[in-house]
Amino acid sequence: MKKILLIVAVLVVVGLAGFFGMRMYTKSFSPEAVAETTNNGVQVKVTYSKPGKKGRLLFGREQDKALSPYGKVWRTGANEATLIELGEGLSIGGKPVKAGTYSLYSVPGQSTWKIILNSEVGQWGTEYNDGKDVLNVEVPIRIRPTVQELFTIYFEDIPGGVNMILSWDQTEALVPITK
């Protein structure tokens, strides 16, 4: 009996070490980051991982082997689903959103992106359940003059709020968040 308990304990320890070791290993390729703002009465915090371009085609047609093909849901970062925490009384793209924490997904397109807030949090980024969507909004993109190697989220002030900028390669999606 003691031998069985010892074997089970060893297997549990090895399994946990493997799990946490793999987690740390994968996160070394896409470091975690936090972007937050309290400007213009808008309180937003985004927790995400920053994948790198690494010479890949990021946004484009599926047949061209784009990492995030046009028209397909993307986790908007790497590893776990990106989390966005919103303060009271905010609208995204003109649509009101309750205060709380959501998963942030996007659907890249050639001239616009769809931004999705999903009520399911804590999952791996590829485990998207569209039945839990609480917001879908189209936003414009702009072209950067230089390449952004690591996916980066930052904020720019606009009248009455901020634009949350999703920036990678030469593409930036502008997500208006207003009070």
Report residues per predicted region:
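Positively charged n-region of N-terminal signal peptides that target proteins for export
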Residues: 1-4
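Short extracytoplasmic
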Residues: 39-66
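Surface-exposed, gly/pro-biased binding rims or lids
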Residues: 122-168
